[in-house]
A protein has these predicted regions:
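Conserved catalytic core of the tyrosine transesterase superfamily
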Residues: 1-291
């Protein structure tokens, strides 16, 4: 029987449990001898399609029940934030400075790029800016008087992001070297230059981060975005201000930030459970005389 031969009345016969069992089936099933899986995100897309299908005919008064609307969307479990721990950040920056664990060939390039690499990674870790915002920086975007950089956010608007002393020192050291580099035509204003004296590309920074981070940890796949997550995590731990973190990271919707750092919120609530002591000492009555 072809699907076009089914009457619309069949839709009214479908129960909520039928759709729930369908979604459960979609978690793992076989097709052409292969196992097919769907996580919550995939099942949510399929339910959304069903909802639209049902809603169209229900709004047109061609079916009596909108059964799909009764089924809640599968709850998506956010993945744990992958980030560097504070000790790993220190090891990473130390390694960039001294070049330990680099190959002989890599060390030849390291002599030329060390100050740039230190400045770039310190900036990413110390401000949480996106890699696209980093490579888009011009020299004039850095304001040492006010300790800030002017970046171009997603959407094209400009924002000022402030940096601390470590970032300032790393940038000043690099800019002293940068003054002696003759940029390629059209790249005169670029802050970070490649060995070809051209503005660095996003892919170049991704490879740079991978090169150094792979020597620090093999259990985490560290990318420039993970350095951004590292900054956001430490800023939230320090301030406990989700709105500040959202503003600094350039999230237009604070719920985006809250979603990413939900695990830290949960950890904070668990810690709060032990913050209030019902008894000052567990043996407070032990010194009282017997009655």
């Amino acid at each position: 029987m072809e699907i076009t031969e089914f009457p619309l009345s069949v839709l009214d016969m479908v129960q909520r449990t039928d759709i729930e069992e369908y979604l459960d089936y979609m978690s793992l099933y076989q097709k052409d001898g292969k196992n097919i899986t769907n996580e919550e995100r995939g099942k949510a897309r399929k339910l959304a399609a069903l909802r639209s299908f049902y809603n169209y005919y229900f709004q047109s008064e061609r079916i009596e029940k909108n059964t799909a609307a009764l089924v809640p969307l599968p709850k998506r479990h956010e993945k744990e934030i992958i980030r560097l721990e504070p000790n790993e950040v220190a090891i990473l920056l130390d390694q960039v400075e001294d070049g330990t664990k680099l190959t002989k060939k890599e060390l030849e390039y390291h002599k030329k790029t060390k100050l740039r690499d230190v400045a770039l990674l310190t900036l990413l870790l110390g401000t949480g800016i996106r890699v696209s915002e980093c490579v888009g920086l011009d020299i004039n975007d850095v304001d040492f008087n006010n300790g800030g950089i002017k970046i171009r956010r997603k959407g094209g608007y400009e924002a000022i992001v402030y940096f601390g002393d470590e970032v300032e020192t790393a940038l000043l050291d690099y800019l002293e070297q940068r003054e002696h580099i003759i940029p390629a035509e059209g790249h005169e204003n670029a802050l970070f230059l490649s060995l070809q004296s051209r503005r660095m590309a996003v892919r170049s920074v991704e490879n740079l981060v991978k090169k150094y981070a792979s020597r620090v940890t093999t259990l985490k796949k560290i990318t420039p975005h993970k350095l951004r997550s590292t900054y956001g995590t430490e800023l939230y731990k320090e301030t406990r201000d989700i709105y500040l973190v959202a503003d600094v990271l350039g999230h237009k919707d604070v719920n985006t930030t809250r979603k990413h750092y939900a695990a830290l919120e949960e950890q904070r609530r668990r810690q709060a459970a032990n913050a209030f002591h019902l008894r000052e000492h567990s043996n407070r009555h032990s010194d009282q005389p017997d009655k």
